[in-house]
Amino acid sequence: MENNDKENNNNNIEQPVKKNRSKKFFWIIFLSAILASAIYVVYNLYLRPDNFLRQIYLVPKDAIYIIETGDPVKNWHKFSESKPWQYLKEQRKMEEINQKAHKLDSVLQANKTLLDLLGRRNLIIAACMTRKSDYDFLFIVDIQKTSKLESLKSQLENLFKANNFRVTKRNFKGEQIQELYDPLDRSTLYLAIIENHLICSYTGLLVEKSIMEKDDPIIGRDLYFLDVEQKVPDGGLCKIYINYRNLDGYLTLFTGVPDPDIQNIYRPLAYTGLRFKVSDNMLSLKGYTSLNDFTENSYLPALLRSGSHPVTVQKVLSNRTAFYVDMGFDDPVKFINNVEDVLQKDKEAYDAFKKNWDLIEKKLKIDIRENFLSWMSGEVAFAQYTLGLLDRQNEFVAVIKMKNKKDAVKNLNIIEESIRKHTPVKFKTIEYEGYEIHFLEMKGFFRLLFGKMFDKLNKPYYTIIEDYAVFSNSTATLLSMIEDYRLGQTLEKDKDFNQFMKEFNNRSTVFAYTNMRKFFPLIRNFVSASSWQNLQEDQNFVLCFPQTGFQLTGEKEMFDTRWFGEFDVLPAAEESDDEETEAETVDFVDREDVLQDLELFYLEKFQGNVYTEFYDDGSVKSKSEMSKGVKDGKYQAFYPNGKLLIDGKFKNNQRTGIWKYFTENGKTFRKEKWKNGQLKK
């Protein structure tokens, strides 16, 4: 019995020991598995060698532009809450973009996991053409070490399935592409993980192009791109890169047909890289632009090699300036020599240049370098004004800074005298308030030296204001500019302009300035009626940027590039009735106009004492013969379409004789007899 009890006691003791050993064994196995998993994760994330790929290597070679940001979520929120975006997104022109932006914002807000995945990850968005009439975006996110997790793809798949996407998979060039179909809008998002990057697009072709690009990248190894990328300043919301090689098709989407003039501007450019910033009152882009090897028949490479010059023409430009372009270089003769060097790469262009150069010198018996370029300081500007006091033509001026005023006047007189001798031009120099106005018939001269923009100056008049020679096709334009300068109404004395100019370099190679609220009404003269109607419907989109400026400053092999847009919304205008009654159209004949001295001078010297009034669109409203500043002689008034409305006479500013009134069909609907300003019955 005792032996049996001892055996039972021993058995009871052995059972707990076995259970304890089993538990220990289980925990050893479990902890070992956890440790092994941890070691595996640590090894994958931190110890296994990184085979990271540069993000830019996945951007297709046909990318039009590239947007890069280091903190996409935070920067998107900052931009979407800014005053410029809050205003612009409500404009009709931004309707489609705003819908896409709203969808992006909704996705980010609704998907915490996606937000955590992106976080402070570097994001590239590349815009690429998908067909001749459309383009789309490719998104590339650098997920860094997260890409080493084997479960990442399945986690993403589960995430999208949880959001009611239908997920399918296919292989392309050894890489797996996940296709995420959204049954709500029937769109498909294509997604792949390539090395350390997550790439996706709503166009599968772009994901495929990205996969093919990684083995033979083009943009990421392009020296012109790398030069720009290295110099773009840090900070801001994002960096923007423009690939000019692929710009033709993209711009045609908006213009309908290729524009050779626009193409000639960007043809010599390779890439522009810019840092983008936004505040409540300013949008800014700052960076660099590189030129390519194909620089034939372009002034930009010549300008790059020719240095820069301080921007100073605002001293004499009227505060009516709507738009102006300023070119600057160290030395004008050196600039022209550089132009010739560039043009020699294109024999046809160079031969045409030399032919026109020789023709002008032979016809006028002058030496262009000696008689024109020698006295220039190195700054040339072309400007367009709003309509002035004297006429309703488009007012253009060219302004040239003089190095030596005395030498400039001497050589301009030589050119003027040569023109008188060798052409049938008859123009007597006139003087207004101490400023002489001269005439030079030099067709094609300014375009030859400074490019197509100056082609508008065929037969210019000129005057001297301070240290600047000012040229224009219109004497009225010059007289108005002289008067503005005399009255101190110049850009230099415009506080808003001066504040805006602080954003730019003091020296410049090319500088373009636009006062959009002055420039927009002038566009009407250059577009069709239907185009003008469309522009008017979208005018708030551009008028909210009252001042914009673009600047290129040559620095060795690249241009320092800057663009700034001032943001300021106009207050809502009160509605008014623009309809004009027949009586109102007729009544302006009785207005007592008091002409200013400038108008009287212009009438006497240039208009044969005929005073002309204009409608807002520039068409003639009335013509009055004048004597000593009052209506005296024939008077005619016209409908806006140019048809005759009134035919009569004035004597000493009073109606006299028979007055006839006509319908737009040319029929007389009323006759009146006047004497000494009194209507006879």
Locations of regions flagged by a protein language model:
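Structural boundary/hinge residues at secondary-structure and domain interfaces
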Residues: S22-E179, L226-L269, S284, Y288-E395, ...
